[in-house]
């Protein structure tokens, strides 16, 4: 596993805390009953292991059954052992949600102006604004606020305002020299006006100002329009991860 991939895997786990986490012979089991976040409710096979693989899979299946959760594995091409994905497929686990992780070395891109109307918010205020932008009650994002607050990451909750209207929101998170771009959202009626691109550029500049060396993000592999936007900003694919699930 390349060092970028391993470090990004560790960082993305840090960015989404779990209620309970267990290390098991190189695998990380995470449990968060009530949360829909798969990264917080899955096994990440990140480090070398020594035990027999089929027995380990059975152990994980029982652990998640005991927790009242489906068994999910979060995998990439470098997951260990190498045959794990094939073994899970043979057990009937479906492959879902392939997601591309993209990286931007900040020293390789020229600085750009931060968009007018871009602002870094207090986390509680951002939750309120983001909930309203998505048309959801604030309570629906309360669990998200708690996960963010408990994660070992420096957060930069941001919004973009145009003509006194919040048109886009997102959040940046710095972990060491890496700065992640998360949850960029623009309502359907306000899309195709460049707001998400403006917010992404402003977050990249926030990353630079914070002292980070790299910006990174995760995007649905099938989301061609979003991928093209990020590629124009200089992001390059590093690896893809996916889930194997019993459900």
Model region roles, listed by residue range:
Residues 53-61, 183-188, 192-209, 228-232:
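Conserved acetyl-CoA-binding loop-helix of GNAT-fold acetyltransferases
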Residues 1-66, 80, 139-140:
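N-terminal charged segments
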Residues 80-95, 197, 221-240, 247:
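Conserved active-site alpha-helix within GNAT-family acetyltransferase domains
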Residues 67-77, 207-218:
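Conserved GNAT acetyl-CoA-binding A-motif
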Residues 139-189:
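A conserved beta-strand-loop-helix scaffold within acyl/acetyltransferase catalytic domains
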Residues 53-128, 134, 138, 244-245:
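Acyl-donor-binding surface of acyltransferase catalytic domains
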Residues 1-9, 44, 99, 108-147, ...:
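Short amphipathic alpha-helix that is part of the acyltransferase structural core
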Residues 21-25, 77, 83-94, 154-170, ...:
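Conserved beta-hairpin
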